[in-house]
């Protein structure tokens, strides 16, 4: 028979999600609840994983579907944000690269109410918040050029990013525009000019949590990860160290045959809290 399309594949994915709970109704798995106060709100992880499952069959649609454009426009948001819930389907690929293709099913089966997917991930894999922040930054920098096992071949024509919105200041610094400021685990990609091979490039980073003009929430838990990504002429990538100081200098030696160069910054809170589906961005954190 002819393929039925990714929409039907998405809905079949929901059937498996329901079945996860039905097979283990007393275990607390399956995410049959929201992540707001008293388990209020919807659950965007259902939509994200159904999309991801559909694209295991319709591979090219990861990148040629309109949801991909939505992802590029919203990657600064929390990965469990309700607005781009149909577009946040790449973190699953990163987790499968680290833990195997079976991991997403394991995550659904072994989650325990009232955990969100991040809490379940940390418990199941045994990582703490600091390590999780490192992993989310590693995912972000790999997403710039789709350097992820299993999707590289489909993303090779979509490498790189457009410049994020920056505001120049009189003291020589650039600040992210509030409209694109990273939330927890969201990220910005700053496009840089490519210097000659062997030249050391540096970025003087200053975290500004609580600054006027940005949303202020749990400012005492502010954190960041940042570093450089080089895309080479042969399609491979070279990554800098991961930097995390609130105020610090990141240094990277430009490799040979560098074609594109980026500076990536991600929100990395020192403590995790759940993101509620409330259709209200004004109570979401920002890490300028």
Segment roles from a protein language model:
Residues 55-81, 235-249:
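Generic detector of solvent-exposed, compositionally biased contiguous segments
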Residues 10, 14, 59, 78-81, ...:
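Histidine (H) residue identity feature
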Residues 70-137, 141-144:
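Active-site-proximal alpha-helical
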Residues 1-62, 66:
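Zinc-dependent metallopeptidase catalytic helix centered on the HExxH motif
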């Amino acid at each position: 028979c002819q393929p039925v399309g990714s929409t039907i594949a998405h809905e079949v994915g929901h059937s498996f999600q329901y079945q996860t709970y039905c097979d283990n109704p007393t275990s607390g798995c399956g995410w049959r609840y929201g992540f707001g106060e008293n388990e209020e709100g919807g659950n965007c992880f259902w939509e994200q994983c159904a999309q991801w499952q559909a694209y295991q069959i319709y591979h090219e649609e990861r990148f040629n579907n309109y949801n991909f454009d939505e992802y590029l426009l919203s990657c600064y948001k929390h990965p469990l944000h309700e607005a781009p819930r149909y577009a946040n389907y790449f973190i699953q690929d990163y987790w499968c690269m680290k833990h195997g293709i079976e991991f997403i099913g394991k995550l659904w089966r072994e989650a325990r109410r009232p955990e969100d997917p991040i809490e379940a991930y940390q418990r199941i894999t045994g990582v703490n918040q600091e390590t999780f922040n490192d992993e989310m930054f590693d995912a972000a920098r790999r997403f710039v050029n789709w350097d992820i096992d299993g999707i590289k071949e489909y993303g090779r024509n979509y490498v790189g990013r457009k410049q994020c919105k920056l505001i120049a200041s009189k003291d020589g610094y650039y600040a992210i525009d509030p409209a694109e400021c990273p939330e927890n685990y969201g990220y910005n990609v700053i496009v840089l000019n490519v210097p000659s091979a062997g030249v050391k490039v540096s970025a003087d980073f200053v975290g500004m949590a609580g600054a006027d003009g940005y949303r202020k929430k749990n400012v005492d838990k502010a954190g960041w990860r940042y570093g450089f990504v080089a895309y080479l002429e042969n399609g491979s990538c070279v990554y800098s160290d991961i930097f995390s100081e609130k105020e610090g200098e990141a240094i990277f030696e430009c490799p040979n045959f560098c074609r594109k160069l980026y500076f990536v910054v991600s929100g990395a809170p020192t403590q995790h809290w759940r993101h509620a589906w409330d259709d209200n961005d004004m109570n979401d954190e920002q890490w300028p």
